[in-house]
Swiss-Prot record:
Biological-process GO terms, alphabetical: photosynthesis
Source organism of this protein record: Chlamydomonas reinhardtii
Example of a GO cellular component annotation carried by this entry: chloroplast thylakoid membrane
DNA-binding found in the keyword field: no
Compartments, record wording: Plastid, Chloroplast thylakoid membrane
Gene: psbN
Keywords noted in UniProt: Chloroplast, Membrane, Plastid, Thylakoid, Transmembrane, Transmembrane helix
Name this polypeptide is given: Protein PsbN
Length: 44
């Protein structure tokens, strides 16, 4: 378990989970109030 491939795989999983968690936080958390909705801006 001391091979570089194990640590590289662990790093990639951590990076993937971090990016996914951050995108969910921005989409549905408190920062989502600042996001604009382009479909509501162009009501026809």
């Amino acid at each position: 378990m001391e091979s570089p491939a194990f640590f590289f795989t662990f790093f990639l999983w951590f990076l993937l989970l971090s990016v996914t968690g951050y995108s969910v936080y921005v989409s549905f958390g408190p920062p989502s109030k600042k996001l604009r909705d382009p479909f509501e801006e162009h009501e026809d």
